[in-house]
């Protein structure tokens, strides 16, 4: 299954992670996948525009368990450099 392939690959990158896009089912699947990868000691990298404070204080109860697990098991690197995506969006307007 796709889930098992994601659970076994050496490194998984969850790009542009945004919990607003997840329903309760999606949050549960992602939590289970991340938990399994942690047990297998596999690399999982999340990229996101979410600030650390938002991870520490989720607005929705469904996000708390996943966010707590991410915070407890990751290095959070905040990049406050120039937002090139926003600049590109403005070029197309």
Descriptions of predicted regions:
Residues 1-11, 21-28:
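Short glycine-rich substrate-engagement loop in P-loop NTPases that contacts/grips substrate
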């Amino acid at each position: 299954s796709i889930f098992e392939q994601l659970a076994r690959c050496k490194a998984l990158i969850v790009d542009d992670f945004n919990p607003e896009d997840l329903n309760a089912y999606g949050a549960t699947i992602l939590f289970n996948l991340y938990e399994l990868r942690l047990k297998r000691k596999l690399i999982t990298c999340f990229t996101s525009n979410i600030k650390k404070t938002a991870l520490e204080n989720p607005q929705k109860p469904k996000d708390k368990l996943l966010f707590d697990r991410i915070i407890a098991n990751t290095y959070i690197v905040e990049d406050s450099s120039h937002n090139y995506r926003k600049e590109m969006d403005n070029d197309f307007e």
